[in-house]
Amino acid sequence: MSVGGVELARLCRESSSEKKAKDPVILDLRKVGGPADFFLVVSGDNEPHLKAIAGEIDRGVEEAGGRKPYRISGNSASQWIILDYGDVLVHVMHSARRNFYRLENLWGDADRIDK
């Protein structure tokens, strides 16, 4: 069974918490016309932490629904990893990079999904 949409975003958030990702935020971009239906933005402390978070999300989603990201951009050395599931983009960012780019503010008109 393949999972998508908000369920996929929530699954990614749950998987990221297994590796202690910080400050997870799901943004619903459907009403604001973003590049995907949902963003998940999470933070990590260092390069190994970012790599572990992204790997756990990839593993968790594959186990739950057999789905792999269409593309993985960036790497832990760039301090920003994007897992592209089509309808969900997962941004795994170093805390400093996240504070610099402030994606949540850029997409400030998007609804936040807390549960």
Q: What is each PLM-predicted segment?
A:
Residues 1-35, 47-81, 95-97, 103-115:
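Polybasic/polar functional segments that serve as interface/processing modules
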Residues 37-39:
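Catalytic metal-binding acidic patch
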Residues 41-43:
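Short hydrophobic/aromatic beta-strand micro-patches
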Residues 83-85:
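Active-site beta-strand termini and strand-to-loop segments that position acidic
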